[in-house]
């Protein structure tokens, strides 16, 4: 068809309009992460990094009160100055979270590895999504910068959809899975059992009845599979 781009050209035009991202979870345990900025946005980033076990350094002339407390109790390291290029040395992950766009862009340019720029996702190479954590269940949501507000709205809906009881149920079936691997001999029956206890219907029962009631039902179900009744 006249005027129609070849497939490879169409793909490159599409890629030029929107970046493509690979969803992944990072293991930050013991890794050096540098946050440039000392305000409320930086504070949120620092708290999430610390929760992930990262070794966090904050670079900023000033700190919010909560960041000061984190520094005082030894949770974070603090470099009390305006950003300098050498501040990123050895960082596994860098987050630019100042209120100065020019500084954020300079940090992004200087970063040699992973870089997230708060409020300017297109300037970095990773996006930090909104997330819901229920024990070992982690659900991440991102609009790739199109609407952070919508990401937050969806996250709040997910928080309601997956209450704390789901975390307890997940821990329970996780431990039960190990027993089932040795107790239910048939691979087909074992897979059937796993599907049944992880079904949408079972999750609905957890929401309605609570973790303990459903766990009792699953234990009974497990014994029937063990005995070969199902």
Language model features: what each stretch is:
Residues 2-71:
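Hydrophobic, well-ordered beta-alpha structural blocks that scaffold small-molecule cofactor pockets
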Residues 53-57, 91-100, 137-145, 158-160:
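Short beta-strand and adjoining strand-loop segment in the mid-core
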Residues 75-77:
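Short, conserved active-site loop motifs that form the nucleotide-linked donor/cofactor pocket
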Residues 81-85:
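Conserved SAM/SAH-binding loop
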Residues 122-125, 129-137, 152-155:
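Anionic-ligand binding region
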Residues 145-230:
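An accessory alpha-helical subdomain
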């Amino acid at each position: 068809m006249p005027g129609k781009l070849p497939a490879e050209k169409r793909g490159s035009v599409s890629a030029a309009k929107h970046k493509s991202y690979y969803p992944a979870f990072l293991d930050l345990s013991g890794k050096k992460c540098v946050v440039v900025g000392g305000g409320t946005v930086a504070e949120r980033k620092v708290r999430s990094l610390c929760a992930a076990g990262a070794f966090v350094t904050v670079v900023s002339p000033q700190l919010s009160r909560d960041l000061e407390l984190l520094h005082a109790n030894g949770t974070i390291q603090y470099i009390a100055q305006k950003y300098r290029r050498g501040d990123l040395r050895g960082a596994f992950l860098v987050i630019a979270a100042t209120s100065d766009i020019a500084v954020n862009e300079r940090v992004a340019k200087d970063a040699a590895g992973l870089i997230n720029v708060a409020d300017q996702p297109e300037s970095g190479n990773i996006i930090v999504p909104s997330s819901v954590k229920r024990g070992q269940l982690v659900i991440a949501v991102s609009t790739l910068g199109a609407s952070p507000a919508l990401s937050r709205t969806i996250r709040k809906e997910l928080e309601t959809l997956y209450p704390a009881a789901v975390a307890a149920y997940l821990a329970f079936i996780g431990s039960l899975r190990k027993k089932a691997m040795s107790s239910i001999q048939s691979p087909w029956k074992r897979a059937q059992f796993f599907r049944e206890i992880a079904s949408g219907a079972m999750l609905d029962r957890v929401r309605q009845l609570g973790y303990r009631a459903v766990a009792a039902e699953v234990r009974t179900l497990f014994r029937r599979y063990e005995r070969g009744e199902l």
